[in-house]
A protein has these predicted regions:
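Phosphate-/nucleic-acid-contacting segments
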Residues: 120-208
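A cytosolic small-molecule/anion-sensing beta-strand core signal
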Residues: 15-16, 37, 58, 169
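Polybasic "coupling" helices that flank or enter modular domains
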Residues: 75-148
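Short aromatic/basic micro-patch
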Residues: 11, 35, 64, 135, ...
């Protein structure tokens, strides 16, 4: 879609599909800072250039807006200004959550938190349905969590051996003990185990 440093002439609303947003470090390493889903805005910046890169994880459909037209519209609508403020507040909260995850949690806690975020996002839409799509690759997950692919795979195997998750086919994982997963994530008992959960690994709070 665009690269960090490109002139920010447009912003976008994601209509369909999943995007990853990322930054490239001076040494060439990629750091994924979030995943975006339908309804999210992409490329919102108070600067004249994009502050991150964005690319598709799956085929996507986007609604494109001229930055100037968007700013003019928001400037003339108190309601839209409040909505934009709420969006930016959510972005800040998500960034703070990610800082906590990377600075305070070990590998197991990070992966458990990642799985819980996907589960909770799906259950916000339909509490009775526990199937969520994760199109991002293991490398994407590793780059988002600040881990190596090997650590992600090893930790997933550990959770499987503990009976907390169970592979379902080639690209799915069933969460058998959501409360235990929440405990291992260091988040407390935020989920109930009433509904076993299936998380698909081959199809992909905001930016999670």
């Amino acid at each position: 879609m665009f690269f960090e440093g490109d002139q920010a002439k447009h912003l976008f609303e994601l209509v369909e599909g999943v995007l990853r947003i990322f930054k490239i470090m001076a040494d060439g390493r990629r750091v994924i800072t979030g995943f975006l889903y339908p309804g999210d805005l992409v490329g919102v910046s108070l600067r004249n250039r994009y502050v991150y890169s964005a690319e598709a994880v799956t085929p996507v459909r986007l609604r494109r807006f001229s930055r100037k037209a968007f700013e003019d519209t928001v400037g003339s609508s108190p309601e839209l200004r409040l909505q934009l403020l709420a969006y930016l507040s959510d972005e800040m909260a998500a960034a703070q959550d990610q800082m906590v995850l990377l600075s305070c949690k070990n590998a197991e806690e990070r992966l458990c938190s990642f799985l819980l975020q996907r589960l909770q996002r799906k259950q916000e839409q339909d509490r009775s349905c526990s199937v969520v799509d994760l199109p991002m690759s293991r490398l994407d997950i590793a780059d988002y969590l600040g881990l190596t692919i090997e650590t992600v795979s090893r930790t997933m195997t550990k959770l499987t051996n503990k009976g907390i998750v169970s592979p379902v086919g080639r690209h799915s994982i069933r969460i058998l003990k959501a409360t235990m997963l929440s405990h291992l994530a260091g988040d407390g008992d935020e989920c109930d185990d009433g509904h076993p959960s299936v998380i698909s690994l081959d199809k992909a709070r905001r930016r999670h």
